[in-house]
Design a protein with these regions (language model features):
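Sec-dependent N-terminal signal peptides
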Residues: 1-19
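Structured extracytoplasmic
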Residues: 19-194, 201-208, 212-227, 235-238, ...
Length: 290
């Protein structure tokens, strides 16, 4: 099941069964629907997309290593908790021509649901015929959607990375610590995140990521190139910072030429699945004597 965009793209060798012409792009400046449902005593908190202040390089009051361990532990918690939620996911990718207009698109909307016995599955609700001509999605795309994102630096993954403190920055109403993240080594057939994370300075939780999946994969006859992307999170039910929006506007550099792309993933309607019912101890009830 695909869960969030990472962005592996393959230069398209001839693609069959494509329909001519691009599909309509989403409205300019469109934003995901509100999905925040915080506690009544907590004001909604959102990692804003564009409002930010200058970065202060003064050392934090809390030891850096303590911050890192704390936000990694919270990432692990968020990853596990999100597996208990249903939500709607909309994913689109467009190629952009030299005039800045879309000339091909892949789009899919799906609901992430559960069977009655609690097994998670993805139900596609809308998937127009793709019109991409210059690139295509690869299996690595789908794998990265699930494994590289949305939670980039859990306790389990932390030993694989170098994490460096950058400074403190205000993202609208959120104070955040910034860290640069890079894999210590690149192991064969392993995928990693490389980029920057913003950690909310009160509860020490990641609220924004900016980077890419690495490494790019170039073999004879194919090139998987990964764009840079930003992922923004919102506070869900007053407890969890879940991803709600990912975007990318990048140029992919292939050996045969550059391809400009625009990608977007929206997550909406987060709802926790399941109801806990407590059952008492069974007792024998004897029938009344006649």
């Amino acid at each position: 099941m695909a869960t969030l965009l990472s962005g592996a793209l393959v230069l398209a060798w001839p693609i069959a069964a494509q329909q001519p012409g691009p599909l309509p792009p989403p409205p300019a400046g469109s934003t995901p629907p509100p999905v925040v449902a915080p506690r009544k005593d907590v004001a909604p908190r959102v990692a804003q997309r564009d409002a930010s202040s200058e970065i202060s390089t003064a050392p934090p009051k809390v030891p850096v290593e303590q911050i890192i361990q704390q936000f990694a532990a919270r990432e692990e918690e968020f990853r596990k908790e999100r597996d208990h939620y249903t939500y709607t996911q909309t994913f689109s990718i467009q190629t952009i021509d030299e005039n800045g207009m879309p000339d091909g698109e892949y789009r899919m909307t799906s609901d992430i649901l559960f069977t009655p016995d609690g097994k998670r599955f993805e139900k596609v609700t809308d998937a127009p015929a793709p019109t991409l001509q210059r690139i295509s999605l690869s299996q690595q795309d789908l794998d990265d959607l699930e494994h590289v994102q949305p939670f980039v630096l859990t306790t389990t993954e932390l030993p694989k990375y170098n994490v460096a403190y950058v400074g403190h920055q205000q993202l609208d109403e959120l104070g955040t610590y910034i860290f640069d993240v890079a894999p210590k080594t690149i192991e064969k057939n392993q995928r990693y995140f490389q980029g920057r994370v913003w950690v909310e300075d009160r509860d020490l939780e990641i609220v924004k990521t900016d980077g890419k999946a690495v490494p790019d994969i170039k073999k004879k006859g194919s090139e998987n190139v990964f764009p840079r992307f930003e992922t923004f999170r919102e506070n869900i039910e007053g407890h969890y910072w879940f991803p709600t929006y990912t975007r990318s506007n990048d140029t992919l550099h292939f050996s045969t030429g550059d391809v400009a792309i625009r990608m977007m993933v929206r997550y909406a309607n987060y709802k926790r699945f399941g109801v806990t019912i407590k059952l008492g101890t069974a007792t024998e009830v004897k029938p009344d004597k006649p």
